[in-house]
Structure formats: C-alpha cells, structure tokens
C-alpha cells in the first residue's frame, strides 16, 4: 500500500446524544472533540441515534423532532415549498 494516502484508522468513541450511551469502535471518522474513557483519551463522534435508542431495537415508539427540519426547508426554499408548481 502507498504511504500517506489512507485515512487514519483508529479507536473512536461514539456517543448517542439522545440517551448518553457510549461505545468504542474503530473508524476513520474525523472528529473535533476528544473524551476520556477508562483512563484513555479517544476521539469523540456524536450521533443522534444508535441501537440503544432506535425504536427498531428498543421496541418503543419514539417521536423524532422533525418540525425544525420542515421549518429549515421552508426557509431555504420559500414559496417553492408550498407544493404548487409554476407553469
């Protein structure tokens, strides 16, 4: 393999932001934050959903906040988002 062209494959902590669950796995993800876990410092990747919070795995239905996404879409596209196409 060529030197210097492959991303850094390392242990990373992924933290589920909905319930605080953390797990360590190997990844090439680029992160800006670090976290100390078990006396060792790891890069931290924050995620919205994991197997600990996803309704498929937990068996509990959870309503996700989509209102913010809809408002952001409407602000971005304005009148075009009304569903009426100009002829």
Swiss-Prot record:
Endpoints of the signal sequence: none
GO biological process: translation
InterPro entries: Ribosomal_bL28/bL31-like_sf, Ribosomal_bL31, Ribosomal_bL31_B, Ribosomal_bL31_sf
Pfam families, per the entry: Ribosomal_L31 (PF01197)
Keyword terms of this UniProt record: Ribonucleoprotein, Ribosomal protein
GO molecular function: structural constituent of ribosome
SUPFAM superfamilies referenced in this protein's UniProt entry, alphabetically: L28p-like
GO cellular component, as recorded: ribonucleoprotein complex; ribosome
PANTHER family: 50S RIBOSOMAL PROTEIN L31, CHLOROPLASTIC, LARGE RIBOSOMAL SUBUNIT PROTEIN BL31C
Assembly notes: Part of the 50S ribosomal subunit.
Record-stated family: Belongs to the bacterial ribosomal protein bL31 family. Type B subfamily.
Protein name according to UniProt: Large ribosomal subunit protein bL31B
Species, as recorded: Burkholderia ambifaria (strain MC40-6)
Top-level taxonomy: Bacteria, Pseudomonadati, Pseudomonadota, Betaproteobacteria, Burkholderiales
Gene: rpmE2
């Amino acid at each position: 393999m060529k030197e210097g062209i492959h991303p850094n494959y390392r242990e990373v902590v992924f933290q589920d932001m909905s319930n605080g669950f953390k797990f360590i796995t190997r990844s090439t993800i680029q992160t800006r934050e670090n976290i100390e876990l078990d006396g060792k410092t790891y890069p931290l990747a924050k995620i919205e959903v994991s197997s600990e919070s996803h309704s498929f795995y937990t068996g509990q239905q959870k309503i996700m906040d989509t209102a913010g996404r809809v408002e952001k879409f409407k602000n971005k596209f304005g009148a075009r988002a009304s569903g009426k196409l100009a002829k």
